[in-house]
Every structure is written in structure tokens, then in C-alpha cells.
A protein has these predicted regions:
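A small/polar active-site loop signature that marks catalytic segments
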Residues: 179-244
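Active-site SXXK
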Residues: 61, 75-93, 142, 174, ...
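Second-shell loop/turn segments in exported
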Residues: 21-30, 67-75, 111-121, 183-193, ...
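Beta-lactamase-like hydrolase cores
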Residues: 4-72, 131-138
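Stable alpha-helical elements in mature extracytoplasmic
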Residues: 31, 35-39, 124-128, 167-170, ...
């Protein structure tokens, strides 16, 4: 048996010391002239088509750069920043939307009371089905009440074909994953009847043979409920993605 010292081997590899890792940026004085020059350069990009904007110093309120700032332009999805700001000022960041289900006038029917949660999930429907099964012996029909929203399903100027294109969904107060069909994220085709789809999905879980639109009767018995994520989470997702 040979001793380990008799074994031949290559040269030992030396590991170089790592470079200094990146450090978080720290506040400092900004070169406003250089910033303006860089923004001017970027704004000349022909791919931007018609472009306008302004940059404000948040400490002084002074405008440090602008390009056609007083020109009216189509705002696209940026207007949702104002909607988000208004919501966070008017509502508590922990505010949740509660979707409730009530027993129908027929004791074997249930009615979903849509409340505005357009990001409902399969897990929420599973939860509702489990709660309903404990409170209702047999479910023959599942209906949904959308009376909380009385406005139009399409905003003025919207192209209905954009629903099939996956860019928008009809404005209804209950949706599963924003009305997406066949996926939970992305620009996939959207449903033309997203609230009814919620009722259909819940009906499938309960083995109900009837699904449709309905209304919650006065003094109806609540049989199930689920909560949306808090407003802070919903607002973050709203401004992060161009999801209309």
C-alpha cells in the first residue's frame, strides 16, 4: 500500500480574494446639470414617440428638468398612480375586501355577494366551498350578486377587442385572477363575464347544477366568507404591473 505522500497531483489552486461587494447607494448631492443632459439625451429616442415629463426636487419642490411638461398627452397606465395615492390617503393600509356567501331564498341555493375583489384565487374558492359544505347540506345552485357596482362594464374609449387581447377585463366586482382565462398572470385573454365565472368555479366545487346572476335577500343567512390581501399589498401589485 502506497503512502499518500507518494501520490502525484497537480499544483494546488489558489483562490483569489473576492472584489468588494456592491454597497447600497447613499444620499448625496445630485449633479442637476448632468441629470438634465442625460434626460435630454434619453428623451430624444425616437422609439418613445411623443414624450413629455418633468422632474421635481422633492425637498425644495423646484422643477429641475422638463420636456413639454404643459403639453397634453395620453397618460396610459400612469393615471393609476393617482388612484393608488387617493386610496392610500382615504383608506387604511390594512383594509381588506370581504366576499361573503349567503343562503338563497331556496335553501339549496347560495348567493355570492361580490364586494370588489378582482384578484380572487383558487385557494379562496376552495375555502368558500369548504365553509359552505359545513353549513349547507346540499347545494343545487350558485348565484352571484354584483349590485355593489352599478357602472358600465367598459370605460369610454375602450376597445372591446382588448378583452380578448388580454389587456383589460370588463369592470365587474368579482373576478378570478383579474378575469384571466387559462392562466393566473400575464397578458392572456380575459373573460367577458368574469363575475359569472367566479360563480361557475364555486359551483363546480360544490357540484351545483345551476349557476347564474342573482341577489342576496334581506336578512339572508351568511354561510361563508373570505378576505382579500390588505390594501398595501393590492396597491403594490396595482402599480407594479400594467394590469387594467
Amino acid at each position: 500500500q502506497r503512502e499518500y505522500g507518494d501520490l502525484s497531483h497537480g499544483e494546488a489552486q489558489a483562490v483569489e480574494a473576492p472584489e468588494e461587494p456592491l454597497r447600497a447607494a447613499e444620499p448625496g448631492e445630485a449633479d442637476l446639470d448632468a441629470l438634465g443632459a442625460k434626460l435630454d439625451e434619453l428623451a430624444k429616442n425616437k422609439d418613445l414617440a411623443t414624450f413629455g415629463g418633468e422632474v421635481i426636487d422633492t425637498e425644495t419642490g423646484d422643477m429641475v428638468w422638463q420636456r413639454d411638461a404643459d403639453k397634453r398627452l395620453t397618460p396610459a397606465s400612469s393615471t393609476k398612480v393617482l388612484t393608488t395615492a387617493a386610496a392610500t390617503l382615504a383608506l387604511d393600509e390594512n383594509e381588506r375586501i370581504t366576499t361573503k356567501v349567503y343562503r338563497g331564498s331556496n335553501e339549496r341555493n347560495v348567493v355570492i355577494k361580490a364586494a370588489g375583489d378582482v384578484w380572487m384565487t383558487h385557494e379562496q374558492l376552495d375555502d368558500l366551498a369548504e365553509q359552505i359544505s359545513k353549513n349547507v347540506e346540499q347545494v343545487d345552485g350558485v348565484y352571484i350578486d354584483t349590485s355593489v357596482w352599478s357602472g358600465e362594464a367598459q370605460a369610454p374609449g375602450w376597445d372591446p377587442e382588448n378583452v380578448d387581447g388580454g389587456f383589460v377585463a370588463p369592470m365587474e366586482p368579482a373576478m378570478l385572477y383579474g378575469g384571466r382565462l387559462g392562466a393566473t398572470t400575464g397578458d392572456v385573454p380575459r373573460s367577458h363575464e368574469p363575475a359569472l365565472d367566479v360563480a361557475k368555479q364555486l359551483g363546480d366545487r360544490l357540484g351545483a347544477g345551476k349557476v347564474g346572476m342573482g341577489s342576496v335577500a334581506e336578512n339572508a343567512q351568511e354561510v361563508a366568507s373570505v378576505d382579500s390581501p390588505p390594501l398595501a399589498d393590492r396597491a403594490r401589485e396595482m402599480v407594479r404591473h400594467s394590469d387594467n
